[in-house]
Amino acid sequence: MAQFIDRRLNGKNKSTVNRQRFLRRYKEQIKESVADAVNRRSITNTESGEDVSIPTRDIKEPMFHQGKGGVRERVHPGNDQFIRGDKIDRPKGGQGSGGSGEGEASADGEGSDDFVFQISKDEYLDILFEDLALPNLKKNQVNKITEWKTHRAGFQTSGVPSNISVVRSLQQSLARRTAMTAGKRRLMSELEEELERIQRSEPPQIMEEMRIKQEIEELRNKIDSVPFIDTFDLRFKNYEKRPIPSSQAVMFCLMDVSGSMDQATKDIAKRFYVLLYLFLTRTYENVEVVFIRHHTQAKEVNEHDFFYSQETGGTIVSSALKLMHEIIEARYPLGEWNIYGAQASDGDNWADDSPRCKELLSNKLLPYCQYYAYIEITRRSHQTLWHEYEKLQASFDNFAMKNIRSVEDIFPVFRELFQKENA
């Protein structure tokens, strides 16, 4: 009786390889769906995956079929109503069967639902932050950020077909066949020598000769039954991620919490910073984040207070920039750290303070920052703070300004600010 041995190493996830191939094949469609999902779901919800939909037309496989037109005769099974030459009336109500669903009629006679499937939390975040990086990251004296690079690392017994090593697999096949047939070949060689001796002997030993020939035939069949290649022989090129020397960095997050920032504007700012925080903590293992909230006064706070504190007041933006400069001087030596800043505000500021903000940025922050991004969240026309900051763009390539008008603008703006230079 035949015995089947399951040597698959994926365990319960026997379709893992197929799933990974599918995600690579429809990468662009999945990225578009994930970008749309960012605006639909709570940005703080990272404990679950996401339902991704792909239009059915994008996943259709190419196929050979008969073209339209021409004269053809077909035999349809089960026909007991028509004979050759009969004409069949068009069904009433259009091309498709009548439906009772609600909604407006369509000009097209047929269609299909999108293909919907679930991606995991890790897959969701990997796709979300793909092709993003901190701009202008440079190596400094002390390296703490752990970045990874893929290297060849020998062979493994499982993997995707594209990584299969033909030479190593054939070597394993030869070794297995040699080990499994060596004893049988040795015994068959001995029997052949015995058969040759018996055939030369007198008188002839017919029965003994037939017995030996039968044993030789059985051994030959057993040797031939050993498969040339088996799944056990397959070897795949193995790749592993190894840490590479990089640089340590600190990101300053400055958020305006003054009275002019209504709840909707604050929510957009928090969503942007949560997205930034997830990106930094997932992409860079040891990057530090400094949270600063400000109204008339600026204060360094922890992560929880930054996102959930209800404190508010007037508006003096320069207080946050001044505090950022003080923290840099006290804790982050310029020769050892890559310094980044991200500032979010609705643009309202005390008129006399806006020139002061421009001066602080141009003299004390931008010359030492790798990158500084200013996000203004407003649907109104820009005020003095925006116009003062605009003067800095001509002088500093490491300074970027973007306007967010609604929740839908958050992710596109975020990608523009942190797109990889070579992506």
UniProtKB/Swiss-Prot annotation:
Q: Which family does it belong to?
A: Belongs to the UPF0229 family.
Recorded hits in Pfam families, A to Z, give:
DUF444 (PF04285)
Give me the stretches of Basic and acidic residues compositional bias: 70-92
**Where are the residues of the annotated region Disordered?**
62-112
User: Spans of biased composition, class Gly residues?
Assistant: 93-102
Q: What is this protein called?
A: UPF0229 protein VC_1873
Which residues constitute the signal peptide according to the record? none
InterPro entries for the chain: UPF0229
Enumerate the NCBIfam families for this protein.
PRK05325.1-2, PRK05325.1-3
